[in-house]
């Protein structure tokens, strides 16, 4: 009996010991949980304070340090909420688990065999048997996973959403995350973020801290809240919207690859489009399509289109721009832009700009059929071209197509210079002059001679330089004059030869665009187009404003140069080109002294070349076509 009883006694003692240990462990865990909760609450409060202070302060100062002034006011409520909410959840869990543990051990003391008790204690010692994980892991893991979920910058922005107070449930946060992503992606981010911040701020004022994941509370992220958000985002939500594990650049005012505004209507984008066109294809397309095309198009239909584009620009800045421009471009624009999109990848939007420009410039005769639909919306711009109308006659359709391509800007194509002025004016007062200025002195002079539009001459150059990158506009001006002149062309040729392959590809894309849009180009315009294609097709940079300049912009073998200058000089260049081509006649390239083919090494267009330009179905893969558009032939 003694021996038989001893094991039971030992087992009972062991069970009691284990139970005591479990209880002690549970109590210890509870204490630790409370401590961790308080710490977490403190951290959250601190982080929230940092976020609140950081956003509010960062908005003005952009510093990551908390704003001591706001610590007292905004964060007083949060500490209580966070501890209570999180502690309430965790406490209930811990008490539940502890009760389970106690019950389990008691039951086991009664029922379980000596072996099971220690095993149960060892395995589940910190939890009820039903709980697969230790109690210490139950509530914290959920919290950690939840925090992890929110660690995403997207989730951080999700905290911005008013629903975030429910962030304790990971599912709700996921939903919020998605919402936040949708909100952040659109080009309207700033406005939506502002409104969302205001709304979510209200919701978050009390619940931010509790609901916001700790990861979202990282104070360092608060550096990025935009200054304008400070008032609204003094609360954490703004910081969440702006910051997360990754900073939300949308709130920052320094441009992201795709400009945050994505709104072509913003005056800054014209400058961005011209200056940054060289840098970013997508950004250029966004800036150009949104900034440049948007500029031209914003007036007629681009602003509506812009918003859609603004939303899509992130993924399809070029596409969005295409869509924006396409309404104006109509058939031509979609084709040219669609092809241009590919070309853009090759030539940084060069093809696109070219097609837009070429399409707008060259389409006149060909585009006449396509332009009619777009012209309806864009033909008003053609009137501004009256200055260049003489040039425009061939460009008359051109104006429609240009207007189609550009909306307001297409007129510059048709008008070349004058249109660009009207284009810019819809966009920005400065831009019209910008567009004119692109041609600047040389281009303007040429344009004056060819188009004889005085308005384009002086006003454009100063403003256009300002509107678009001033440096580039001078370049474009020189490009216009020089492109027609031998020296600049030679420079471009050097760059072109260096980029011959890429340019050839660009040319192909551009030619495809030109071919697809060749119908847009009239035979004369085709000549212009071929000239532009031969000269600037490759060089046509992805600047919609430059589209008109296409010939010249493409003239510059260097799309980047043109891109920088594109915003400003291309209008003048395109104006000059169009005006010269239109005014001198589509075939003027061959005979026009302004465009000495010999100096430019541009062979006169042959019937085949014209046919290729005019044939929308023409396949550029044809070696003859390739030959026609070879860089060396430029």
From Swiss-Prot:
GO terms for biological process: cellular response to cAMP; energy homeostasis; entrainment of circadian clock by photoperiod; memory; negative regulation of membrane hyperpolarization; positive regulation of CREB transcription factor activity; positive regulation of transcription by RNA polymerase II; protein homotetramerization. This is CREB-regulated transcription coactivator 1. Binds, as a tetramer, through its N-terminal region, with the bZIP domain of CREB1. 'Arg-314' in the bZIP domain of CREB1 is essential for this interaction. Interaction, via its C-terminal, with TAF4, enhances recruitment of TAF4 to CREB1. Interacts with 14-3-3 proteins, including YWHAE/14-3-3 epsilon. Interacts with calmodulin-dependent catalytic subunit PPP3CA/calcineurin A. InterPro entries: TORC, TORC_C, TORC_M, TORC_N. It is found in: Cytoplasm; Nucleus. Transcriptional coactivator for CREB1 which activates transcription through both consensus and variant cAMP response element (CRE) sites. Acts as a coactivator, in the SIK/TORC signaling pathway, being active when dephosphorylated and acts independently of CREB1 'Ser-133' phosphorylation. Enhances the interaction of CREB1 with TAF4. Regulates the expression of specific CREB-activated genes such as the steroidogenic gene, StAR. Potent coactivator of PGC1alpha and inducer of mitochondrial biogenesis in muscle cells. Pfam families: TORC_C, TORC_M, TORC_N. A motif (Nuclear export signal) lies at residues 242-258. The modification Phosphothreonine is found at residues 149, 161. One of its GO terms (molecular function) is cAMP response element binding protein binding. Residues 151-174, 271-283, 296-305, 314-331, 446-479 have a biased composition (Polar residues). Phosphorylation/dephosphorylation states of Ser-151 are required for regulating transduction of CREB activity. TORCs are inactive when phosphorylated, and active when dephosphorylated at this site. This primary site of phosphorylation is mediated by SIKs (SIK1 and SIK2), is regulated by cAMP and calcium levels and is dependent on the phosphorylation of SIKs by LKB1. Residues 194-208 have a biased composition (Basic and acidic residues). It is linked to A chromosomal aberration involving CRTC1 is found in mucoepidermoid carcinomas, benign Warthin tumors and clear cell hidradenomas. Translocation t(11;19)(q21;p13) with MAML2. The fusion protein consists of the N-terminus of CRTC1 joined to the C-terminus of MAML2. The reciprocal fusion protein consisting of the N-terminus of MAML2 joined to the C-terminus of CRTC1 has been detected in a small number of mucoepidermoid carcinomas. Highly expressed in adult and fetal brain. Located to specific regions such as the prefrontal cortex and cerebellum. Very low expression in other tissues such as heart, spleen, lung, skeletal muscle, salivary gland, ovary and kidney. It comes from Homo sapiens (Human).
């Amino acid at each position: 009996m003694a021996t038989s009883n001893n094991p039971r006694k030992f087992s009972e003692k062991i069970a009691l010991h284990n139970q005591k240990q479990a209880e002690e462990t549970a109590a210890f865990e509870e204490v630790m949980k409370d401590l961790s909760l308080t710490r977490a609450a403190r951290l959250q409060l601190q982080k929230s304070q940092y976020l609140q202070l950081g956003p509010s302060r960062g908005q003005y100062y952009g510093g990551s340090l908390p704003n001591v002034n706001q610590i007292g006011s905004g964060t007083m409520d949060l500490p209580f909420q966070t501890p209570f909410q999180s502690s309430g959840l965790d406490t209930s869990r811990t008490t539940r688990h502890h009760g389970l543990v106690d019950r389990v051990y008691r039951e086991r003391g009664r029922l379980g065999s000596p072996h099971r008790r220690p095993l149960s204690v060892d395995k589940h010692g910190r939890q009820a048997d039903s709980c697969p994980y230790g109690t210490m892991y139950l509530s914290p893991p959920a919290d950690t996973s939840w925090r992890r979920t929110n660690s995403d910058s997207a989730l951080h922005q999700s905290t911005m959403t008013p629903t975030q107070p429910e962030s304790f449930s990971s599912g709700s946060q996921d939903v919020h995350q998605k919402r936040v992503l949708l909100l952040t992606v659109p080009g309207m981010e700033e406005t939506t973020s502002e409104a969302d911040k205001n709304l979510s701020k209200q919701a978050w004022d009390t619940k931010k801290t509790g609901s916001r994941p700790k990861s979202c509370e990282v104070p360092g992220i608060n550096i990025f809240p935009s200054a304008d958000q400070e008032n609204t985002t003094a609360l954490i939500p703004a910081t969440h919207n702006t910051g997360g594990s990754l900073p939300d650049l949308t709130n920052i005012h320094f441009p992201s690859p795709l400009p945050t505004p994505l709104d072509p209507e913003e005056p800054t984008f014209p400058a961005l489009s011209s200056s940054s066109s060289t840098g970013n294809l997508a950004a250029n397309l966004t800036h150009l399509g949104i900034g440049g095309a948007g500029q031209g198009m914003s007036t007629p239909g681009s602003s509506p289109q812009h918003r859609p584009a603004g939303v899509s620009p992130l993924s399809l800045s070029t596409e969005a721009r295409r869509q924006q421009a396409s309404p104006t471009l109509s058939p031509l624009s979609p084709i040219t832009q669609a092809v241009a999109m590919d070309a853009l990848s090759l030539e940084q939007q060069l093809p696109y700009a070219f097609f837009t420009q070429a399409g707008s410039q060259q389409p006149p005769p060909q585009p006449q059929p396509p332009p009619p639909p777009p012209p309806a919306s864009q033909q008003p711009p053609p009137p501004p071209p009256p200055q260049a109308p003489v040039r425009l006659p061939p460009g008359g359709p051109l104006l429609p197509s240009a207007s189609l391509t550009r909306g307001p800007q297409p007129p510059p194509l048709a008008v070349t210079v004058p249109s660009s002025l009207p284009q810019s004016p819809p966009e920005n007062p400065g831009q019209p002059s910008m567009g004119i200025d692109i041609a600047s002195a040389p281009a303007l002079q040429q344009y004056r001679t060819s188009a004889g539009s005085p308005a384009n001459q002086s006003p454009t150059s100063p403003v256009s330089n300002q509107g678009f990158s001033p440096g580039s506009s001078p370049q474009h001006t020189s490009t216009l004059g020089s492109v027609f002149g031998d020296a600049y062309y030679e420079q471009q040729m050097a760059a072109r030869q260096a980029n011959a392959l890429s340019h050839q590809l660009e040319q192909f894309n551009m030619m495809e665009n030109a071919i697809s849009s060749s119908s847009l180009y009239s035979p004369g315009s085709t000549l212009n187009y071929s000239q532009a294609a031969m000269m600037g097709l490759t060089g046509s940079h992805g600047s919609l404003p430059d589209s008109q300049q296409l010939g010249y912009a493409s003239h510059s073998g260097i799309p980047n140069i043109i891109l920088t200058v594109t915003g400003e000089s291309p209008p003048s260049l395109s104006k000059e080109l169009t005006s010269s081509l239109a005014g001198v006649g589509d075939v003027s390239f061959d005979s026009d002294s302004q465009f000495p083919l010999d100096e430019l090494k541009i062979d006169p267009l042959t019937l085949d070349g014209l046919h290729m330009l005019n044939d929308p179905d023409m396949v550029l893969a044809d070696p003859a076509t390739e030959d026609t558009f070879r860089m060396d032939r430029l």
